Design a protein with these regions (language model features):
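Non-catalytic, peripheral interaction segments enriched in hydrophobic/basic residues
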Residues: 283-311
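A conserved non-catalytic segment of reverse transcriptases
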Residues: 96, 105, 211-279, 283-285, ...
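Short helix-capping/linker segments at secondary-structure and domain boundaries
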Residues: 16-23, 132-133, 299-302
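Conserved polymerase palm-domain catalytic core
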Residues: 23-27, 32, 39-217, 222-225, ...
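Glycine/proline-rich, flexible active-site/cofactor-binding loop segments
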Residues: 1-25
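Duplex nucleic acid-engaging cores and interfaces of nucleic-acid transaction enzymes
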Residues: 3-11, 37, 41, 55
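"…together with the soluble PPM/PP2C metallo-phosphatase catalytic core" -> "…together
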Residues: 5, 89, 93, 241
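Structural motif
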Residues: 1-7, 85-86, 114, 118, ...
Length: 311
């Protein structure tokens, strides 16, 4: 978008974001204030270790940002409390704005959000927020009032075990499941393969019929975290037994490690052939900042020392 459109989109973002943030699900971490990939990984590890979620459902949406249904998106904004018809009309015009392609032709988009648009990340969260709450409604939000309160349970450490008490309060016949989402990349954690198969099928159908989004069958699957790694946001997640407990093991995923290696190799080659001292200094600074950036992002992994040693 041109600079004028960017200014207008930023103004709209500052109006929409506080309203939408109040309605977004708590386990969504992508493109939101004071939330990051680190929080998403930490929540995934918590579910694996404390809630004993052994199976994870990976669902890959085909070209999500290019296939968002405009009519559905505008209805979702209205449902979230954006009821100013003039503002809705402006957002609609932004979504329908013609795009000039490299070959000189003009395309009039019928679906999708603008590439590189300031509003696009927020609109993506608006679309998938409905999925978050639907998954949560299957288990996390289901409660009942019991005539007899659940018996208090105390752990060996002396801490009150709320998890078992909450489990007694569930009123649903559906199985335990939790979603952790970062933009269009999300995982659904379950306890058994049977539950995972059911939620995989249900989620695929729900995305197709409710949000008009297609799922890539080749990239969608179920992983037993005790046997295989599952990749999420550049990390590999796995469960391993230690002292009769399940402990999460996290590392850099293979693709991320390979990309980091290649990037650093290219920068080292550039350092070896400088044209002058100033260029040498600039390239060394760039190399150092790249190393620090990789370290800062992946330092939360439990076995990152193995990956760094290999790099």
């Amino acid at each position: 978008p041109c600079i004028e459109d960017r200014i207008i989109q930023q103004c709209i973002l500052q109006i929409l974001e506080p309203i939408c943030e109040a309605k977004f699900y708590e386990k969504s971490y992508g493109f939101r204030p004071n939330r990051s990939a680190e929080n998403a990984i930490a929540e995934s590890v918590r579910l694996m270790q404390r809630s004993h979620m052994q199976y994870v459902v990976d669902v890959d949406i085909k070209g999500f940002f290019d296939n968002v249904n405009h009519r559905k998106l505008l209805r979702q904004l209205w449902t979230l409390g954006i009821t100013d018809t003039k503002l809705i009309q402006v957002i609609k015009q932004m979504l329908k704005a013609p795009v000039l392609l490299p070959d000189g032709t003009v395309e009039y988009p019928q679906k999708g959000t603008p590439q590189g648009g300031i509003l696009s990340p927020l609109l993506a969260n608006v679309v998938l927020n409905e999925l978050d709450w639907w998954i949560a409604s299957q288990w996390h939000l289901q409660w009942k009032v019991m005539k007899k309160p659940p018996q208090m349970q105390i752990r060996k450490s002396g801490v009150r075990d709320l998890a078992h008490e909450y489990r007694d309060l569930r009123t649903t016949n559906l199985k335990e499941m939790y979603i952790v989402r970062y933009a269009d990349d999300f995982k659904i954690f379950c306890k058994t393969r049977s539950d995972a198969n059911k939620i995989k099928f249900a989620t695929t159908q729900w995305l197709n019929h409710r949000l008009k989004l297609e799922v890539s069958e080749n990239k969608t699957g179920i992983t037993n975290l005790k046997r295989k790694y599952s990749e999420f946001l550049g990390f590999k997640l796995k469960l391993r037994e230690k002292s009769n407990k399940n402990v999460a093991k996290t590392k850099m995923c293979d693709k991320a490690r390979l990309r980091a290696k290649e990037k650093l190799k290219e920068q080292i080659k550039a350092i070896q052939k400088p044209e002058n001292d100033m260029q040498l200094f600039t390239r060394i600074c760039k190399y150092n900042s790249t190393v620090i950036g990789i370290q800062n992002y992946y330092c939360i992994a439990t076995h990152i020392f193995e990956d760094f040693r290999e790099i």
